[in-house]
Amino acid sequence: MRTYITNLNGHSITSTAQIAQNMVTDIAVSLGFRELGIHSYPIDTDSPEEMSKRLDGICSGLRKNDIVIFQTPTWNTTTFDEKLFHKLKIFGVKIVIFIHDVVPLMFDGNFYLMDRTIAYYNEADVLIAPSQAMVDKLQSYGLTVKKILVQGMWDHPTNITLQAVNHKKLVHFPGNPERFNFIKNWRIPTELHVYTDHNMQLPTTVVKEPYQSDEQLIMKMSEGGYGLVWMDDRDKQYQSLYCPYKLGAYIAAGIPVIIQKGIANQDIIEKNNLGFIIEKIDDISNIVESTTEEEYMEIVSDVRRFNPLVRQGYFTRKLLTDAVFSALNSM
C-alpha cells in the first residue's frame, strides 16, 4: 500500500487555494505521500478522449488498495472533479476527500451543483471537512459518508524567527479591497494595515502596505498589532462553515486575533485565549484601545505557546495520519 495526495498547480503565486493545497502536499510528502499533480487549465479544450488520457496520466502510478487524499475542489470545474474521482475509483484505491471549499455553498449561482457534489462525496471512503458545522450542512443536503474527520485549523508552516512584540494599536489584514468591501468602507479610528498590490482610493485610517512574501509578512506582523478575520455580510454564512487560511498566518506570527463571532474556529480561539471574538466591526476600536499592555502581552504569550502546532504543521500531520488510519480501519 502506498499513499498519494492530489496537488493544484498553475494558479497565481498569490492564490490562496493553491497555497493551501501546496502546503498540505508538502507536509504529506514529508510523511511519505507521493504527489499527484493537477494543473489548472480550461477543460473545454479537451475532447473526451483527451480528458481520459490526461486523467490516466495523473493516476498512472496507482495500484489497487493504495490511498489517495483528493484535495477538492481542483478549481477545474465540478465536471473535472467528478471525472477524476471516478477515474481514481477504477484503479481500486481508497479515496479520502479533503474538502477545502464547497463551491455550491460559496456562490449562490453555483448552488445547482450541490446534488452532483454530494453524489461524488458520498462515494468517498473517508471525508475531511473544515468544521462540524460544514458536516452538518452537507448532511442536510444528503451526505451519507460514515467516516468523517474535522480539520479545525489551517497550519502555516514557517521557520521565521518571531520579532520582539509591542502592543501596536493597529490591525493587520492581507487581502484584496475589491474582494473585501469592508476595507473600502472602513470608518473606525483604528488603523487597518492592508497588504495588497491593488491600487485604489481607501479611507484615511486604512494604511496600504505592499504585497509581501510570506516570510516578510510573518516577520512584520510579529512585531505587534492584531490579526483580523472578517468577511462581508454576503459571506458570513459561509464563514461559519470553513477554515479561513489567514487565521493560521496570524497565529504563526504570534499575535492576538480579532475574529467575527460565529467563525468555524471560534472554539479554538476561545479555549486557548488566542484573541477576541466580536459581533460588529465597530467593536475593534474598543478592544484595541481598552486592552492594556499587560493583557496584550498575556495573550501574546498564549498565542506563542500554541503556535508551534501551526508553525510545524501538526494539525495537518495529525489529520493526514488519522485519514490513513480511518481508511484502513473497518469501523
Curated annotation (Swiss-Prot):
One Gene Ontology MF term: nucleotide binding
Annotated segments matching region Substrate protein-binding loop: 106-111
Positions that bind UDP: T16, R179, Y211, Q212, S213, D214, Y242, C243, P244, Y245, K246
Domain of life, per lineage: Bacteria
UniProt keyword annotation of Glycosyltransferase present: yes
Gene inactivation effect: Altered modification (probably glycosylation) of Srr2.
Gene3D superfamilies: Glycogen Phosphorylase B
InterPro entries: Gtf3
GO biological process: protein glycosylation
Keywords of this entry: Glycosyltransferase, Nucleotide-binding, Transferase
Pathway noted in the entry: Protein modification; protein glycosylation
Entry keyword Electron transport: no
EC numbers: 2.4.1.-
Cystine residue pairs: none
Subunit text: Homotetramer; a dimer of dimers.
Function, in words: Required for polymorphic O-glycosylation of the serine-rich repeat protein Srr2. Catalyzes the second step in glycosylation of the serine-rich repeat protein in this bacteria. Transfers glucose from UDP-glucose to the terminal GlcNAc moiety of 3-O-(N-acetyl-alpha-D-glucosaminyl)-L-seryl-[protein] which results from the first glycosylation step of Srr2; does not use other sugar nucleotides as substrates. Complements deletion of the gtf3 gene from S.parasanguinis strain FW213.
Family: Belongs to the Gtf3 glucosyltransferase family.
Record-linked HAMAP family: Gtf3
Domain notes: Dimerizes via the C-terminus; dimerization is required for tetramer formation. Binds protein substrate via an exposed loop in the N-terminus.
Protein name: Glucosyltransferase 3
Lineage of the organism: Bacteria, Bacillati, Bacillota, Bacilli, Lactobacillales
